[in-house]
């Protein structure tokens, strides 16, 4: 059964200010809710198992609490406002009006109803939800949430972040499949994008496909002006609500991908686009048919329903191709774009064949492009992941038909694998100005060629990933301006987190394998021969790189010219990955 979807919350400044005051007073934070739940229940909830959390807060939903909130039988903390708010807005429980009134003294129950975040509960359904079997019954003084209102915590170099993010109620709270227009809260992909986005002071930031607005909120801490776009009017309503609740200024525009910002350039573009590859026929649909580019009339029988937060209404991975082909024109000189995405691998292609084809034009224009594949699934695994995400399990009668639809779609393009990862683009200050920006450019030097780097990395080390990737982009730019003679004349240092790992057969003197292992960043492991390992080990800034290579060759009787020619590209790679520093 699919959940009904209520109207989006209303943007009423006075009531939002009262709600904010109540949330602050209640200490409705991630840390506080985890204290209330305990380690076991909090951990289970992160795995999307709400049962331990419901047990921990069960006294709040006891029938005795409806007529007499003082009768709540449990620890004092369970009767506190943070517990009430969490049970109501995250677990989807029906709670006594009196308890809610105590938790929201400034806003009040009526104010919460006017905002569109609460409604009277009707008993008979799960957790007091409307029951078609008893439509005339009344709740006896209980209310339920119309939105998920979750605390959010993060930290950047400007300090601790504590926000609240409103979105549509999750499947966990409603017990029903998601509505096609569902607006997602802060999911795993949102957290990933927030972790990899550079956090540096900039002028203009664009969030493409903003959803409930979390990336725009993060960007506001470093930008003078943030613009967030989405095709979904409902998503923009939630984003506006969240910006106002958290006292953040964001300009919101409705439209598909980059259409709302035609002719404009930005210093930073972030996007968690609806990249999920879903059976949608063989060609892109006209976006005028509906918010996801499809309509009920042109959806084939057995074709999965579209969810606007994940489905872009395009065939295969063409939405990502479309977005990446258009992005460069919107990057100002020195500007960076960071996004997540999926790409298909067909037939005997290399995993990066599609990203390379999409980014060839950007590279030719002088941009630096970096694709990092973090995960890969076969077609069956991918289908299972996203059918489950839509609320269908293997026990559901629709499961075989849905899986078959995905596999048939992949077979039509001979897809053998699907990758997930990061795409980063940077327009160097010296690269040719974009068409949109050319009227403001005095004519920059576009002679420096662009670069295109792809790698598969699955690890994560210590440190801040956003800073690590930003440093890598700067190093790509720096090295592109440095010839081999300049590099050889540089004094390099090995990174403090770098170690060498040697594999030896028992009793052998010489290693069968040498690896350079990174402790920070993406925790890369790079195979090395004796010459590279010896060179890296000696790079402490005392000698130049060229002198160090010459010394290693003298000790090993290796040919200096051949060794240098072989090692310099490897050293460049180690500089980009942060294993070496200039």
Feature map (PLM): residue ranges:
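Intrinsically disordered, low-complexity terminal tails and inter-domain linkers enriched
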Residues: 63-79, 123-141, 284-303, 431-456, ...
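SAM-dependent Rossmann-like transferase core, predominantly class I methyltransferases
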Residues: 121-130, 136-205, 210-218, 222
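Flexible, glycine-/basic-rich loop-and-beta segments that form/coincide
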Residues: 379-438, 445-483
């Amino acid at each position: 059964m699919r959940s009904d979807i209520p109207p989006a919350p209303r943007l009423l400044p006075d009531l939002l200010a009262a709600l904010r005051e109540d949330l602050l007073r209640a200490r409705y934070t991630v840390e506080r809710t985890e204290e209330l739940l305990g380690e076991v229940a909090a951990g289970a909830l992160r795995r999307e198992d709400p049962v331990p959390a419901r047990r921990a807060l069960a006294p709040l939903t006891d029938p005795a609490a409806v007529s007499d909130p003082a009768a709540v039988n449990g620890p004092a903390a369970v009767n506190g406002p943070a517990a009430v708010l969490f049970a109501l807005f995250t677990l989807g429980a029906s709670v006594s009006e009196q308890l809610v009134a105590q938790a929201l003294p400034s806003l009040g129950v009526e104010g919460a109803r006017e905002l569109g975040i609460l409604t009277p509960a009707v008993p008979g359904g799960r957790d007091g939800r409307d029951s078609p079997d008893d439509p005339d019954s009344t709740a006896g003084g209980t209310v339920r949430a119309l939105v998920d209102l979750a605390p959010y915590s993060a930290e950047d170099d400007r300090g601790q972040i504590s926000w609240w993010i409103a979105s549509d109620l999750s499947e966990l709270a409603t017990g029903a499949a998601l509505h096609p227009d569902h607006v997602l809260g802060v999911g795993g992909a949102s957290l990933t994008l927030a972790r990899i986005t550079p956090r540096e002071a900039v002028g203009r930031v664009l969030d493409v496909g903003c959803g409930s607005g979390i990336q725009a909120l993060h960007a506001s801490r470093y930008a003078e002006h943030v613009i967030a776009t989405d095709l979904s009017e409902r998503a923009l309503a939630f984003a506006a609500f969240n910006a106002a609740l958290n006292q953040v200024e964001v300009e919101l525009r409705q439209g598909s991908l980059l259409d709302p910002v035609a002719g404009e350039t930005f210093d930073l573009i972030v996007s968690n686009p609806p990249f999920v590859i879903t059976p949608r026929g063989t060609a892109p649909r006209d976006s005028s048919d509906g918010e996801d580019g499809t309509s009920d009339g042109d959806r084939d029988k057995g074709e999965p329903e579209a969810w606007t937060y994940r489905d872009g209404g395009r065939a295969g991975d063409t939405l990502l191709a479309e977005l990446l082909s258009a992005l460069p024109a919107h990057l100002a000189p020195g500007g960076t774009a960071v996004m997540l995405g999926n790409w298909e691998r067909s037939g005997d292609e290399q995993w990066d064949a599609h990203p390379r084809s999409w980014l060839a034009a950007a590279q030719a224009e002088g941009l630096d492009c970096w694709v990092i594949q973090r995960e890969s699934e076969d077609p069956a695994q991918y289908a299972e992941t996203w059918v489950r995400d839509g609320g269908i399990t293997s026990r559901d009668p629709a499961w075989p038909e849905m899986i078959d639809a995905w596999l048939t779609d992949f077979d039509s393009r001979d897809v053998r694998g699907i990758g997930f990862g990061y795409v980063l683009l940077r327009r160097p200050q010296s690269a040719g100005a974009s068409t949109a920006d050319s009227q403001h450019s005095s004519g920059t030097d576009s002679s420096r060629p662009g670069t295109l780097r792809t790698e598969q990395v699955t690890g994560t080390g210590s440190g801040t990933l956003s800073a690590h990737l930003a440093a890598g982009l700067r190093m790509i730019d720096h090295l592109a301006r440095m010839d081999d003679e300049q590099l050889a004349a540089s004094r390099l240092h090995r990174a403090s987190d770098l170690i060498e790992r040697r594999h030896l057969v028992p009793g052998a003197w010489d290693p069968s394998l040498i690896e350079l292992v990174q402790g920070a960043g993406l925790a890369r492991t790079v195979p090395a021969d004796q010459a590279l390992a010896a060179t890296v080990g000696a790079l402490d800034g005392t000698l130049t790189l060229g002198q160090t290579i010459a010394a290693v060759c003298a000790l090993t009787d290796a040919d200096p010219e051949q060794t240098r020619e072989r090692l310099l590209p490897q050293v460049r790679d180690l500089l980009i990955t942060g294993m070496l520093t200039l």
